[in-house]
Amino acid sequence: MRQHVNPLSRFFQLPLELPAPHELFEHPNLPIHLDIGCARGFFLLELAAMQPERNHLGVEIRRPLVQAAQHDRDRQEQHNLHFLFCNANISLEAWMAALPPDQLQLVSIQFPDPWFKQRHRKRRVLQPALLLAIAAALHPGRHLFLQSDVLAVIEPMVALVELSNCFARPKDDPQPWRSSNPLPVATERERYVQEQGQPTYRVLFERTQAELPALRDLEMAWQQVDNSKDAAPTPHG
């Protein structure tokens, strides 16, 4: 069972200076795939072995999972892969901003902790500031991939991305949800959901040439959308 941590607790609010690519990877100039909330890391351990042409970075807020994943990475000598402990909403923005232009080519957020209640909005992994930092680091045509098995988790993420106007779904991509994963490896959670015969909700976004909105404007728009959903009347049978 997944153990949640509160990202708003004081311990997780301390910013960390994350290592630069040359400290993480054997070939630091390769394109980077960033997986936010990588959990135990099995997905990236498998994917990095299949994609040596990319560097893969997994970040996770639960330190014991990062330590176990990094141990496996070291044992397997996967030099295009690294795992880091951090709160993505506190420490990732500066790291992404320091990357060379167009080095970050894919960001994935898969099956994040289900903080779906409106009062827990600030605990969700994809916050407006983090989204804008991702959008700033991704060049047009690069991708943001989201998936979850909980509609109440992925719908606010999709709403936030669409409100930013910085991303669009690729032409002819299925809507509202992709039936297939664009990545060649499934996460542990994805495999479990498939075994149970339950749906997975996936969206692939492509960075457009649109300029970033003001952070305050995006925060207010997102809050209005969330509040309107909470205020919607419940049907009575």
From Swiss-Prot:
What top-tier enzyme class does this entry carry? transferase
Q: Where does S-adenosyl-L-methionine bind?
A: 35, 60, 87, 113
Annotated signal peptide: none
Q: Which reaction does it catalyse?
A: guanosine(46) in tRNA + S-adenosyl-L-methionine = N(7)-methylguanosine(46) in tRNA + S-adenosyl-L-homocysteine
For molecular function, the Gene Ontology terms on record are: tRNA (guanine(46)-N7)-methyltransferase activity
Q: Which sites are catalytic?
A: 113
Q: Which UniProt keywords apply?
A: Methyltransferase, S-adenosyl-L-methionine, Transferase, tRNA processing
Protein EC: 2.1.1.33
Positions binding substrate in this chain are 117, 149
Q: Which PROSITE patterns match?
A: SAM_MT_TRMB (PS51625)
Judging by the UniProt lineage, the source's domain of life is: Bacteria
* SUPFAM superfamilies, alphabetized: S-adenosyl-L-methionine-dependent methyltransferases
Q: Which GO terms describe its cellular component?
A: tRNA methyltransferase complex
Task: Report the pathway entry.
Answer: tRNA modification; N(7)-methylguanine-tRNA biosynthesis
Q: What does this protein do?
A: Catalyzes the formation of N(7)-methylguanine at position 46 (m7G46) in tRNA.
In the record, the note on similarity to other proteins reads: Belongs to the class I-like SAM-binding methyltransferase superfamily. TrmB family.
**What is this protein's name?**
tRNA (guanine-N(7)-)-methyltransferase
